[in-house]
């Protein structure tokens, strides 16, 4: 079955932003965009499909690109997950309302073990995914992010910024260095342009966004299980606002890179 980019849709401004971000990814891969709206009951499907199809057809005409409208009935989280599998989605882009809906977002993205989510709150801000920020620590599971960076670079020829916390513990420092070496081996082999930046571990979330304020990345990659912490621990007002502008790609440790033409680790 042909792969697609999935956009869970709710007729909000944020959903429209997600559609634009999805198009940036889809137009290079030539894969269709599927807009999915979930309704409570079967009897509502036909009515809402008419409305969603208007949006899909308008976007398709304006961009000369294939956009499909899909309306399903059922539990929101289960239905999004089931359709993602059914439609062979390899990537999903979803609009969020930030901290206000973080629990809802977590319920969706944690189900998708093999499908990463890009979460957006704003229009495309800096550019077309040609700057990628990858925060790392001593967790080996985070290496899945480097493989997704490799894939995104194949599409956009991106510059990558690895940001890590300076730690005193020798064991943790060794693990961080091992992760950096792992990334270096991948990026150098594929001639991916990258920089490595260290920040103070105290207030890491804010220090990370301070760096991103300077480099202006088009997307930042977090492990799904660290997404909530990475957002809720931001304290500085300027960084709270910045976090709304930079799309977040949530990656699970078991993401199936093989189906994207990458490799396992």
What residue ranges belong to the model's regions?
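CheY-like receiver
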Residues: 25, 79-83, 207, 211
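Charged docking surfaces used in two-component/phosphorelay signaling
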Residues: 71-79, 201-205
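A short, acidic, amphipathic alpha-helical segment used as a generic capping/interface helix at domain edges
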Residues: 184, 201-213
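Short, aromatic/basic amphipathic alpha-helical patches
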Residues: 49-59, 175-187, 211, 232-241
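Short, flexible loop segments at the rims of nucleotide/cofactor-binding pockets, characterized by
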Residues: 68-72, 138, 195-200, 227
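A short helix-to-beta-strand connector/capping loop
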Residues: 61-68, 189-195
